[in-house]
UniProtKB/Swiss-Prot annotation:
Residues 39-48 have a biased composition (Low complexity). This is Protein SPIRAL1-like 4. Belongs to the SPIRAL1 family. It comes from Arabidopsis thaliana. Acts redundantly with SPR1 in maintaining the cortical microtubules organization essential for anisotropic cell growth. The modification Phosphoserine is found at S80. The lineage of its organism: Eukaryota, Viridiplantae, Streptophyta, Embryophyta, Tracheophyta. GO terms for biological process: cortical microtubule organization. Residues 1-127 are annotated as: Disordered. Ubiquitous. GO terms for cellular component: microtubule. The keyword Membrane does not apply.
Length: 127
C-alpha cells in the first residue's frame, strides 16, 4: 500500500513550520510603546433638553501637543529629498533609466520599422 496522506518521506526539518503550524510558538519581538507629543482627551456630557425632556449628548475632543515636532508621514508615504515637481507627470522622461522610450511612434498600418529584419525596403516599395 502507499503512504498515508500527510506523511513525510524523510529529509530535513521543514522551514515552513510557520505556515503549516509546527507546534512551536514563535516569540514576538518587543515593540517599544510609541511616544508622541500629542494628547487627546474626549469628554461626553449628557443633559436633558427642557423643551421635550429628551436627552441631549455633547461630545468634545481636545488634542494638545507640541506642534513644533517634525511631521510624521502616513504609513506607505515616503518622504524623500528627491521628490521634485515634474510638470509632465511622474512617469515622464528618463529619470529612472537611460533606456529609450518604448512609446509607439507610428500609427497602426503605417510604415514598418522592421525592414532591416526582413530585408525589404520601405512599405509599398518593390526592389
Amino acid at each position: 500500500m502507499g503512504k498515508a496522506r500527510g506523511v513525510n518521506s524523510g529529509g530535513g526539518e521543514s522551514s515552513l513550520g510557520y505556515l503549516f503550524g509546527s507546534g512551536e510558538s514563535v516569540p514576538k519581538p518587543n515593540k517599544p510603546n510609541a511616544k508622541t507629543g500629542f494628547t487627546t482627551t474626549t469628554t461626553t456630557t449628557t443633559t436633558t433638553d427642557g423643551a421635550g425632556g429628551r436627552p441631549k449628548t455633547t461630545t468634545t475632543t481636545t488634542t494638545t501637543g507640541d506642534k513644533n515636532k517634525t511631521e510624521e508621514n502616513s504609513a506607505g508615504v515616503r518622504g524623500s529629498p528627491n521628490n521634485y515637481y515634474r510638470s509632465d507627470g511622474q512617469n515622464c522622461g528618463n529619470f529612472l533609466t537611460e533606456r529609450p522610450s518604448t512609446k509607439v511612434h507610428a500609427a497602426p498600418g503605417g510604415g514598418s520599422s522592421l525592414g532591416y529584419l526582413f530585408g525589404s525596403g520601405p512599405c509599398g516599395s518593390d526592389k
